[in-house]
Amino acid sequence: VVEVLEINKEKIAKRAGEPIEVKYVLDLREFPGTPIENKIVHDYKVIAEDPEIGIVVETMGGVEPAFTFVKAMLEAGKQVATSNKNLVAAKGAELIKVARDHGVNFQFEASVGGGIPIIRPLNKCLTADEIEEITGILNGTTNYMLTKMTEEGADFDEVLKDAQDKGYAEKDPTADIEGHDPCRKIAILTSLVAGQQVDFEDIHCEGITKITPEDIKYAKAMHRAIKLLASSRKVGDSYTCLVAPYMIDDTHPLSGVNGVFNGVFLRGNVLGDAMFYGSGAGT
């Protein structure tokens, strides 16, 4: 975040109407010899109680202590932006209410879809539409792995190690390969269109650990691609959500989303079909 604010300093200042300066960085560690060494603080209350601070960006990850910190910032009248999907999936509705009660914004565009701007279109541009379906490739790590298995005939363990070596997969890849990561993301997107909190723990979730090279061969023979999809469909007055590997026809827009890229396919009763595409893992 600090790097982006520095690289695009002039452009950001022009769009904001004034310079955006980083005053504090909250961390347990010290960073001697770096540009932020004099900005490090270890107590979040220093930030919450400083009247000069108008915007807080949370990049900690996890639900706690992020929830405690973010709630305190909103209650102190700070605008908050986060990329923390775990926090938004678990506490998003509560934090949105806290923000509304205190006349500030809780923004979470970066929590879903990597480099794809999907939250704002759903929240702002498509509010008059009845969104009937959201289907997405929402995890760049597993999409990279499935692409490698498809293109090179590699097995699961081999492509997982490759993804870890490249920094796409964590040392503990459970959240990615078991589908927990896209499950949280589809819960967030469904919450937006449903107008109420959708609990990710209620969504059936299956990852890619059982996919074999033989499965890939069968899919290719049928002109299909295996993708880990997170989907949400409107059924009557409710929504049905699912995360699982699918075999999709090679004419489907998502079949061409490969490597670390993400894609989100929307269907609205007025909009019709729309596709959002952009970088996933590593962004």
Task: Please state what every model-predicted region is.
Residues 158-256, 261-263:
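Substrate-binding/catalytic subdomain of NAD(P)-dependent oxidoreductase enzymes
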Residues 61-63, 139, 248:
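Short glycine-rich anion-binding loops that position phosphate/pyrophosphate groups of nucleotides
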Residues 1-76:
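N-terminal glycine-/serine-/threonine-rich beta1-alpha1-beta2 phosphate-ribose binding loop
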Residues 40-42, 58, 81-83, 89, ...:
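General beta-strand structural signal in soluble alpha/beta enzymes
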Residues 60, 65-76, 83-124:
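Rossmann-fold NAD(P)-binding glycine/threonine-rich loop
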